[in-house]
Amino acid sequence: MHNDKDLSTWQTFRRLWPTIAPFKAGLIVAGIALILNAASDTFMLSLLKPLLDDGFGKTDRSVLLWMPLVVIGLMILRGITSYISSYCISWVSGKVVMTMRRRLFGHMMGMPVAFFDKQSTGTLLSRITYDSEQVASSSSGALITVVREGASIIGLFIMMFYYSWQLSIILVVLAPIVSIAIRVVSKRFRSISKNMQNTMGQVTTSAEQMLKGHKEVLIFGGQEVETKRFDKVSNKMRLQGMKMVSASSISDPIIQLIASLALAFVLYAASFPSVMDSLTAGTITVVFSSMIALMRPLKSLTNVNAQFQRGMAACQTLFAILDSEQEKDEGKRVIDRATGDLEFRNVTFTYPGREVPALRNINLKIPAGKTVALVGRSGSGKSTIASLITRFYDIDEGHILMDGHDLREYTLASLRNQVALVSQNVHLFNDTVANNIAYARTEEYSREQIEEAARMAYAMDFINKMDNGLDTIIGENGVLLSGGQRQRIAIARALLRDSPILILDEATSALDTESERAIQAALDELQKNRTSLVIAHRLSTIEQADEIVVVEDGIIVERGTHSELLAQHGVYAQLHKMQFGQ
């Protein structure tokens, strides 16, 4: 992810504006309603002059007759405009949140695997949920305050200047002083807000780890460790919030003090005979009341800066993700079905952020329809080889060919359509069994095809025992299934996909011996006429492979058939002896 660029608030908002612009009709309606709302308040104050000078001054008693009707009308107008503005702003805010979340979700789906290796799931979830909400809610709340309070200030100033420009001119001095005060605290607000976004990600990550690993926490007695971890990040979040409150609380009294000094000076100036001669009781009441009324919008405008800076800080974290480079998909070649010839030529690969290569000078040919097994100790590079075929990572040196063409010549969609993957880490979705088997292509397959795939994977036995059979919801990541059942659903998914290239990465590791024997027949059938790359820990499952390749520290050290490798008395023979106790 790129570093958060310290963009100015204006630059950040300009970049956000194209997301808001399609919904500007709602903003315009809300703006008009807010201005009318502020105007009704200002006009209400202006009624004090005729009420005092004419009504209670007994020069025009009719004022007391029409005044109640005007007040009722103004309150009705105020209520209507308040509803319209709130509704329109909420509508725009909801649309912006939805748009930002969709952009983030779509962009993240196009990110390379290396991106997710470096980012915690909790932080990314926080970006999609919390930060995107902050952008819209803070910005919309700030907009309401700026328009309504800004209109109030302008209206009050106009009215004050109309009734007594001599007294009102004093308040003009306030503007630059208030502006300086707001600018001073702006940077502080934005800095704290950025820290709050990051801390919220840590809170989400800590909670997510506990929820996902709840069984491990219980079995290993990790309650105290997880509690301390969560207490630490939640307290950090609290401290950041207190810093924000502190900065906001300091700015409020400063602005109010400046305004009160100006107000005191106005009262003093009003006592001058030259000024008093031109003032009536109604006029001085209107001007003085307007000055007091200015306190609220001035305070709100000071607070809105913190709110707006919080939204812009969240916006910058989202733009940092949106600026991250997605998977390179520069290939043009599109095929319906590959023959399945695979070849690694002098391939070297290093994981991003590491210095030592995970694979070095790998040369490997897998003819179409043949089965090649990769064996070796944990961390030797077996799964890395498999992940390069699907271009989850791009190699540093060399070439990987499919049907004689470099993998980078194919579009990613076309390439990955040729590969079915069953790994030891099966991910299932909170959906029906049938939809998990036919994942992403439910419309392409008939019910009979889905059932046949499940039957071939020896999954129908336990599926039929479920309340709703294939239509049973299996919970998040198949929480309602055993490890072996989840694995068989994944194998059924691969059987249904019917791709020419098959990768089995410890595909039977979660199965008991009896289930493994049962499903091995289905896997043998699945591997017929397909290019198969089998990564196995149990050597008994790969003895019939056309070729067995032994990987050690990222290098191919042995290759041959099962019997040939045993005869060499090398690494494979040692692994075989360790497993079978010979």
UniProtKB/Swiss-Prot annotation:
Predominant cellular place of this UniProt entry's protein: membrane
Gene3D superfamilies xrefs: ABC transporter type 1, transmembrane domain, P-loop containing nucleotide triphosphate hydrolases
EC assignment: 7.5.2.6
Transmembrane segments: 16-36, 64-84, 153-173, 253-273, 275-295
Intracellular or extracellular location(s): Cell inner membrane
Gene Ontology molecular-function annotations: ABC-type transporter activity; ATP binding; ATP hydrolysis activity; ATPase-coupled lipid transmembrane transporter activity; identical protein binding
Lipoprotein among keywords: no
SUPFAM superfamilies (UniProt xref): ABC transporter transmembrane region, P-loop containing nucleoside triphosphate hydrolases
Root EC class: translocase
Domain ABC transmembrane type-1: 28-310
Residues bound to ATP: 376-383
Entry-linked Pfam families: ABC_membrane, ABC_tran
Catalytic reaction equation(s): ATP + H2O + lipid A-core oligosaccharideSide 1 = ADP + phosphate + lipid A-core oligosaccharideSide 2
Assembly behavior: Homodimer.
Family to which this protein belongs: Belongs to the ABC transporter superfamily. Lipid exporter (TC 3.A.1.106) family.
Known role: Involved in lipopolysaccharide (LPS) biosynthesis. Translocates lipid A-core from the inner to the outer leaflet of the inner membrane. Transmembrane domains (TMD) form a pore in the inner membrane and the ATP-binding domain (NBD) is responsible for energy generation.
Domain notes: In MsbA the ATP-binding domain (NBD) and the transmembrane domain (TMD) are fused.
Protein name: ATP-dependent lipid A-core flippase
Species of provenance: Salmonella typhimurium (strain LT2 / SGSC1412 / ATCC 700720)
Protein's gene: msbA
